[in-house]
Amino acid sequence: MATTDVFIISSSPPRRLVSHIASSPPLPSLDKMVNGKKASNLRQGSSVAPIPTGATIFASASTLLRESSSGSLQGFDNARSFVTSAVQDENDLKKSAKPKAPRKTAPKKEDGTVEKVAKASRKTVKKKDKDVSGDFVDELVGEAAEIIAEKKPRKPRAKKGDNAEGKSGSVAEATVEKKPRKSRAKKAVDATGEDLKEKVPRKSRAKKTDVEAGIETVPKEKAVRKPRAKNSDLDSNLQSKMVKGRVTKSAVNASNTHKVETSKADTGNKHFAPNPIVEDIVADEGFGLVEAIRRRTNWTPPKSTKVPIDLEDSPEAQESDTSKGFAELLGSFGYSSYQADSIEKRISSGVSNGAAATRKRKLIEMVTTNIPREPGSKTTKEKAVKKKARTLTDLATSAYATAEDDDNLLDAPTPLLQYFPHAAPEGSTNNGFKIPPKPRSKSPMKRVQKSKTGSAEEPILLSPESAMKQVSNQDFVFGTSSQLAREDSPSLLRDLHDAMQASNELDDYDDPFVSPPTKIAERGKAVVAAKRNLWSIAARDNHGDLMDVETIDLAHTPVAKPDRIMLSQKPSSLVTPGKDDWFDIDEIEDNRPPSTQVPLRETGPIERSINFQLLDSPTQPKNTSKDSSKVFPQKKGTKSLVDKSTTPKKVDASKMPDYESFTTPQLTREIQKYKFKQIKSRKRMIDLLIQCYESQNRPALGVLQGNIPIITQNSLEKSKDVADSSTQVKPTIPSPRRGRAKKVTTSTASLPKSKAKSKMTDTVAFLEMDSDTPLSKIRTPQKSRKGKQPLEDIFDSDHPITPSPPRRSDSQIRKISKALELSPDNNQDDEAQQAQLFTHIYTAITKAPPSQDPFNPSWHEKILLYDPIILEDLASWLNTGALSKVGWDEEVAPLEVKKWCESKSICCLWKENQGGGARSRY
């Protein structure tokens, strides 16, 4: 029967394959997962041996012993593989076992001994025979039970009895000692009457009998089952489970005494627990393996640096490895085999000893790594000597750039660099923490050498004032800085800045963008609502003058008499200069730019005769007969002269054509002669032609004897010349100017009368520049004869009273005359008068009562609120009683108000925009 049992256990090769997989199951059972109790890993941490190269399964204690003593343990290895199949059979029996089966107790024999009886199962091994084969099988089954205790400590196992040598009893006792986590059943009283310890009643086990006095007992195999659910005695189970790895039998054999003491000595660490199976098997062989295993437990800590086998499968092993620090690893190398201290003491001693050891190693590494740095520093010195092509950016920032040589870094008193010995050329230091004295002694020598190369020195921290001065002396050119800096011309940048500043300097008086379109008023044409358009503004240069046309200032240039021959022979009542004398433009205004100065020349006798013949030419009526339907057909003769001339500058006739009588194609051709673009508006074309004609003929008239600084006298004589030329061109047409022109050409006695008549034409000239009325209606002879309103004499009260135009009041003419009169003799008086006027304006604005309406503040409140001041409105407010209240009886022009605002830095603007219309918003 025993032979049959052996055949059943050793059979079924497929179960051997399954047993290899189940020897270390990857996951615990379902009941363990539900109860929340982790399966303990007996092989983990530092006690785990590395995986052999040719291993196919997980290594165990038997495989390690087999490698150390393969000859003596070969039989045990064969028996080990044979028992594995029996263990698998027992695992299968656990699943089919009934829950209440292990509660049955074994019956007592007649001799007083207790027989171990387990519940009969279908596949378990029954009573064994007492022959040699049965004893061998019992040993194998006992070893299988021990394997179950190692791998699955929570599952119950059957206990075996040994009838032959008593070895099975010792093995069973070791099994009890190695199963701390399993619940056990109550044990009966042995043959001597001693009580055994009561185990956990959760899983009952068969009662044991102590093998003493040679009594043989045959153990029964117990049916293994899965752990049940928690019973009512859960508290007692938990209390018994807390004591792990410390439960031993009260009565142990003499051979196991030393094993129990060893386990108690090392219970603090379960990784160093001895293996009782290996000790029992190897003890009889006499190879000294037990002592080797003891030495192995003491020598285990240095192997903690190796990766364990079950590192990924067991999270507890990972936590135990990660908890060890670097100091612990270093301290393990300083372990002495003669020390008997615990692991904690060895780690602590390793930390204290390892700190000094690591410092020495770091010092050695630093000394060795500093050796190749010295030639590296020499190479950087050679690179610093090389001169590079400096760019503009480098030149500008050289004053602030610090030297980037490695020597400067070594010489700098940085605390961190003082601990590096590569600063010393010799590199000899005692302990690595002392500062070498030689770099400091050599630092001034290196600085002297760098000063010879010409590199920039370290800048000194300057005060704000000196720093601003240094910045102002630097020359920066913004743009592309890829060009190399040229050092041959250091003054090039300064000259460039001076030229740019000179080009940006513009005279505010000549800037057309400073003043509004009513700038003609300040030039002698009164406060005119002139039709300045885009073309007339675009055709002017930076000074506001027409381009490609020689112009003079209309306001500040004295107007000469048109009739140069006759006027040169008559004496002047006001000014009688010599024949070669005239007023220079520079004497009138010294601030005028040289571009607007008129070249002065003297008219010779040949030119006078030519001009006289042109005025008395008989071919003019033929040219003007085509346009006899016009009001002034004689003016077409002047146009014919203009057509004959190649350029407008060659026209010497002082009479301006009547552009109002021209047709649109004729106006277009006239504009093309002045090299202007085509203009669609007829009114704008006429205004542009009038301005061009006046600017064209002024230089020829400015060199005659009639250069009187009084503008009104010059304008009177100019209108007189227009009347004379009209009567000479066409004598057949009855005109009131005909007789007067003959008197002017025949005798000089009628000069006072001509002056009196020219008073009227002076006002006509103002209307030509100020009003929107066509020139044909303004220059009609009926208006000049029928005007009966008296006109106040501005400068010459000796002349007879002439009628004033109906569209101009006395106050307006007085303001125009005050704005137009400028004399170099009265410049200082004008400045003093202007300063006095500014004082009165300031007093009038500040003394005015504040406004009660928040939406209509006073002028002073507007200035304080930084509101833009409308010059025309402020001038009208000052002239309506504000100035008279502060003691100023005269009126003020908007231009003077503008100058006062600019002197006080007040934001001001004109009511009229650049297009000639009123501003819609401010």
UniProtKB/Swiss-Prot annotation:
Keyword list, A-Z: DNA damage, DNA recombination, DNA repair, Nucleus, Phosphoprotein
Comp. bias intervals (Basic and acidic residues): 107-118, 194-211, 258-269
Annotated disulfide bonds: none
Biased composition (Basic residues): 96-106, 437-450
Region (Disordered): 86-134, 146-273, 299-323, 367-389, 420-458, 612-657, 717-813
Highest taxon above the source species: Eukaryota
GO molecular function terms noted in the UniProt entry: 5'-flap endonuclease activity
Post-translational modification: Phosphorylated in response to DNA damage.
Ranges annotated as biased composition (Acidic residues): 310-319
GO biological process: DNA recombination; DNA repair; DNA replication
Main location: nucleus
Function: Regulatory subunit of the slx1-slx4 structure-specific endonuclease that resolves DNA secondary structures generated during DNA repair and recombination. Has endonuclease activity towards branched DNA substrates, introducing single-strand cuts in duplex DNA close to junctions with ss-DNA.
Protein name: Structure-specific endonuclease subunit slx4
Source species: Sclerotinia sclerotiorum (strain ATCC 18683 / 1980 / Ss-1) (White mold)
Gene: slx4
